[in-house]
Amino acid sequence: MLETLFRQDAQRRLGDIGAADIIVGIPTYKNARTIAPVMRTVAEGLAREFRHLKSVLVVVDGGSPDDTVAVANQMQLPPPVKRLVMSYQGVQGKGSAVHAVFEMARVMRARAVVILEADLQSIAPDWSTRLARPILENAFQIAIPYYLRPLPDGAMTDLLAYPLTRLLYGADVRQPMGGEYALSADFAAKLAARDVWETDVARHGVDIWITTVALLENVKLCQVRLGVKLDDSRELSLSFDPTFVQAIGTLFRLVDIYKRRWLENVATRPAPFYGNGVAAEPPRAWMPAVTAAALGDAFVAGVRRYQRLWRIALTPSTRTAVK
């Protein structure tokens, strides 16, 4: 599978590094502004907390037209952390990059795989180590984040993913679409072998897919407190974009795939937490300026764009009331 994801020169560089204990993968696309501080912060944490382990920081790029790859290649990381910057082949999207990291972990016989986002502004040195520790200690097979986010950054999670996951599957996990997580090598290998990497899972559906598979296939899962998540939101988007369609489309496809599970009407159970941590309120300075007028304009634009679907989904009386 590795030969279909990377060119031969990239495969050679992977072979030169050899085996690893922990791989931290960072999918990138047009992240030239943010990749350096994220890499620096991650490497600092790995060098401090896991100095006795062989850690590899992998940047997996999706063909960025900016200087993302050049910036990542120029980064000097503290020993013993190794750096690997590669571009994958195939469907462009975060899921394809995650798939590539899973395949690299298999080849390098890693014990733990961590995935982080490339535009994190609030990342701390211990984020990757906090996520990896329950995996390295064989306590859990996947660790997902628990953090607070300023509005409306977490709208998809707060309004759809979290309530649906809790209601249908009886799983109280606050961030089922969190973009940061750690997995055991075995679980990562099983996910990599699934026949989903030509679907929206290869794009922005990957995060909710991984969490849902873990919850419904009896994979040992824990939550890890990371505090507050702030990312590099270049501009506030209140419209339906490909990210929304891919992520929520995957969410609803999973609802259909696992229909037998939610028809069982299981009781809600909280996912356990691992370790300590803080969950402070987001600083007011980081709260985006969302006005009632902007929300209203976005709603009207959505109504116009999806009138045909509204006619299918809503009764005439409901449509009249909305108008």
Residue ranges and their predicted role:
Residues 61-69, 120:
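A conserved acidic beta->alpha catalytic loop
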Residues 55-58, 69-96, 104-107:
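Conserved donor nucleotide-binding strand/loop of the catalytic core
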Residues 1-44:
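N-proximal low-complexity "stem/linker" segments adjacent to membrane-targeting elements
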